[in-house]
């Protein structure tokens, strides 16, 4: 039984490691204001990585649904999209807390903040669409198409348009090119926490998604749709 749960155990261990060593590891002092707040990097950025991975899985299942018309695939797509959206909201919240300390306000209209907000609103519309439809087959079909559209909208809103202008985010000024992550600012010590954090948070998202899937599958069986 344990061999089937190894990844859940791994998620727990990695997050325990992140939440302990992440506050103990030596971090670089980039400026007088950043100081210890840079530890939020172990929580804020992995949320966005986890979101992208979970939404990609949701995309795959939406494509599978359009090929198979199986409501099982729709259940998977919806569950992973929901968890991805939650990770995105957590990314916004942790970013706002960091911005309030670093920039003096939780929301300063930074291009990356605005792009992230637009991306999340697009995915919120996915769930509004699902809630507005009654017929299960029609809901699954239209949702799958919209989910595919939503995923590809992540690229201009998160990765392309915000990088065409300067940002208050690290590396977003001058000739650095406004990268998604400024690798120069992440020390070797930080990497020992950051990468496990990405894996740990993502596995947690998958774990919660599987629980949601089990509940939805039971509901569909009760309704006679499976």
Question: What are the residue ranges of the model-derived segments?
Answer:
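Polytopic transmembrane helical bundles with strong interfacial aromatic enrichment
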Residues: 1-226
């Amino acid at each position: 039984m344990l061999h089937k749960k190894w990844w859940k155990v791994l998620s727990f261990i990695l997050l325990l490691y992140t939440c302990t060593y992440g506050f103990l590891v030596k971090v670089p002092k980039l400026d007088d204001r950043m100081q210890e707040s840079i530890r939020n990097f172990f929580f804020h950025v992995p949320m966005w990585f986890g979101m992208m991975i979970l939404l990609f899985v949701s995309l795959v299942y939406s494509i599978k649904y359009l090929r198979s018309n199986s409501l099982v695939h729709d259940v998977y797509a919806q569950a992973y999209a929901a968890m991805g959206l939650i990770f995105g909201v957590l990314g916004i919240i942790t970013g706002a807390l960091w911005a309030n300390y670093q920039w003096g306000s939780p929301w300063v209209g930074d291009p990356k903040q605005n792009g992230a907000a637009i991306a999340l609103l697009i995915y919120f519309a996915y769930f509004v669409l699902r809630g507005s439809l009654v017929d299960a087959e029609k809901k699954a079909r239209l949702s799958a198409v919209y989910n595919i559209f939503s995923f590809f909208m992540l690229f201009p809103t998160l990765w392309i348009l915000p990088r065409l202008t300067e940002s208050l985010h690290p590396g977003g000024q001058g000739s650095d090119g406004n990268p998604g992550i400024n690798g120069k600012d992440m020390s070797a010590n930080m990497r020992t926490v950051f990468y496990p954090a990405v894996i740990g948070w993502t596995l947690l998202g998958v774990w919660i998604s599987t629980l949601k899937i089990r509940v939805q599958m039971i509901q569909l069986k009760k309704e006679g749709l499976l």
